[in-house]
């Protein structure tokens, strides 16, 4: 995955991609399969490959034609799952193919934007794992490119395809909660061995041969150049050069659905806080983190998560008339991953609530975790219909505003102010 685009020259480089790459895009017939490539074949890439294969098994309207990965052992393992697919180390070589319709991007965060932009310029639709990009500036470039090329982009926030958030949106719009003034959520867990401390193959590296070879220079791309570091390669989420830590990995999952439930708008003010309170393994990203954002629609969203305590705040939408209590979406303590929500009236409105509904609280069924497959199916459905997917580029961009600025707030010790277009006023 070689990339010569520097951070400083990112916008100019993105604008010039179309001159270097010939635009193509097949027009799919009713019986045509969506020719799909997977770029990045670590844990998440293999998970998404499985979802694509499930789609193929159920609908037979797609096929995986190409796989790309810089670590040879991962590439070989994935190739065994898809015997007919051609393998690549360089994504640029993969994108020279004339038959591609869709690209699934499952690399570390710092590669999301460069590969997505290159795929869009080739006329491909893109499913990109969350976060949409590594930085807010990159997200603005990507959303502009999606519009310019009239492509489909799905950001990998599975919950945006669940029935849960469509029901929540309907309840919010019905006025049952009154004016929603605050939302809170969490994505917490407790790993005493160190979250993201995935297994390391000590034999793997840039000097190794065969299956153990890693093309470290390509993996680094535009990130700061350094000697090979196995911890950075196998556990990239621990380091700022390749990830935003809890914010980009976990909070993105919570903030995007809140944008669906309320309004999809850029926040007006963002702060991030927390710290590296427990882990002492050389990581840079905090093990406990809070994202807080105010919005032009006059409400606030807070997401508080930890990797060393699983009891995060309850998932709530707090209105002037009632509060909606939702179960945790992912992980957390047993018993909180419920598919049932409760709407409980505020004390001053309890009598009116009882008169209207005939009960002192409303139980909402079927608002739990619907899994991952619906989101991948939504992407392929939209590739064919040309309708906007559930976590489209505009949603991904506006969510990225809150996510990236919370990281910058934490790292720079400042609160960021944003205008309605997403421009950071004091950045």
Where in the sequence are the language-model features?
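N-terminal secretory signal peptides and thylakoid transit peptides that target proteins
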Residues: 1-17
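N-terminal Rossmann-like NAD(P) cofactor-binding module of classical short-chain dehydrogenase/reductase
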Residues: 103-104
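N-terminal glycine-rich "phosphate-gripper" loop used for MgATP/nucleotide binding
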Residues: 107-109
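Beta-strand-loop-alpha-helix segment that lines the small-molecule cofactor/substrate pocket
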Residues: 113-161, 175, 413
